[in-house]
């Protein structure tokens, strides 16, 4: 398995096990779009260290909690949305321990944030604890989600492209044209505000999982039902509260099974349908 495939599987597992509202399809599309941009498509899960002038400035920064010699480099940015500084590693540790009962200490072992066992947890923490971020994601407000993640609109066009790709694949469509035709939009292959609004609306109404990339899911005006399932992340005392539709849970489980090459004899029809489709999600 390639390092990228390993990271794909790890990120999917973290979202399933710890993501809570991130498992709602409209929110999941926003989350994946931001993490894919921030990590360069999962190529970078640790800050590239020079050190640059800015990185040398990490040393001794009280606002980052870097109070000991070497803290600047030791607590460099890690994860698919980078967590930087001793204070943030400590805060993340406290949140994971309190929320999930997990025995982990990112302050003591900062490299865990880039490990397969914990990759993605920092990004999940960021999304779940930043005021208004989940609400903006639920509303399909890509601009405000970007501002909350980035502080501005750096790389905004690339984030939009990632959103298009993630939303289309979550919905089971191969191209923008395919979706536009199905949604009754002008078929020009260009994803603009109207197409993205329609993508968000469709994600909000998914009630059945697609069987293949060419068989889009059925839309419904009813909310997705709860369908949480156990995971294989590090042991936790309690699962994160989640509101997930069968589409989201199936996507995560099916994607994980395919990506890690798991062989389970008793796969249900529900999971096996997703396994084939989800293999192409990040391609």
Model-inferred region functions:
Residues 206-283:
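Cationic, hydrophobic amphipathic alpha-helical membrane-interacting segments
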Residues 19-31, 44-47, 133-146, 187:
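Surface-exposed patches in mature extracellular/periplasmic domains of secreted proteins
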Residues 37-47, 133, 152-159, 186, ...:
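Secretory-pathway/luminal and periplasmic proteins that interact with or process carbohydrate-rich
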Residues 35-38, 136-155, 176, 181-183, ...:
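Acidic helix/loop microenvironments that form the catalytic cleft of cell-wall polysaccharide enzymes
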Residues 111-120, 127-165, 244-251:
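Long, repeat-rich segments with strong aromatic
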Residues 1-10, 31-126:
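Peptidoglycan-targeting cell-wall enzymes and recognition modules
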Residues 1-2, 17-21, 30, 70, ...:
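Second-shell loop/turn segments in exported
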Residues 171-219:
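Short acidic, glycine/serine/threonine-rich helix-capping segments at coil-helix boundaries
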């Amino acid at each position: 398995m390639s390092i990228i495939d390993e990271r794909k599987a790890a990120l999917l597992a973290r979202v399933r096990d710890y993501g809570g509202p991130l498992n709602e399809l409209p929110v999941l599309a926003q989350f994946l779009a931001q993490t894919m941009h921030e990590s360069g498509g999962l190529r970078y899960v640790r800050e590239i260290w020079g050190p640059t002038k800015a990185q040398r400035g990490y040393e001794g920064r009280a606002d980052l909690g870097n109070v000991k010699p070497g803290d600047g480099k030791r607590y460099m940015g890690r994860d698919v949305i980078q967590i930087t500084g001793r204070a943030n590693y400590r805060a993340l540790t406290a949140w994971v321990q309190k929320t999930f009962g997990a025995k982990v200490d990112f302050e003591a072992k900062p490299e865990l944030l880039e490990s397969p066992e914990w990759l993605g947890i920092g990004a999940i923490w960021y999304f779940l604890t930043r005021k208004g971020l989940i609400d903006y994601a639920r509303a399909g407000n890509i601009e405000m989600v970007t501002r909350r993640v980035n502080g501005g609109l750096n790389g905004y066009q690339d984030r939009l492209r990632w959103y298009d790709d993630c939303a289309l694949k979550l919905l089971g469509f191969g191209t923008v044209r395919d979706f536009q035709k199905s949604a009754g939009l002008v078929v020009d292959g260009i994803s603009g505000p109207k197409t993205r609004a329609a993508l968000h609306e469709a994600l909000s109404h998914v009630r059945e999982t697609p069987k293949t990339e060419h068989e889009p899911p059925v839309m419904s005006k009813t909310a997705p039902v709860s369908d949480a399932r156990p995971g294989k992340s590090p042991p936790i005392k309690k699962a994160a509260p989640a509101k997930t539709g069968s589409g989201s849970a199936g996507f995560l489980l099916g994607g994980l099974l395919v990506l890690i090459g798991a062989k389970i004899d008793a796969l249900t029809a529900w999971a096996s349908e997703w396994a084939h489709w989800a293999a192409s999600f990040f391609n």
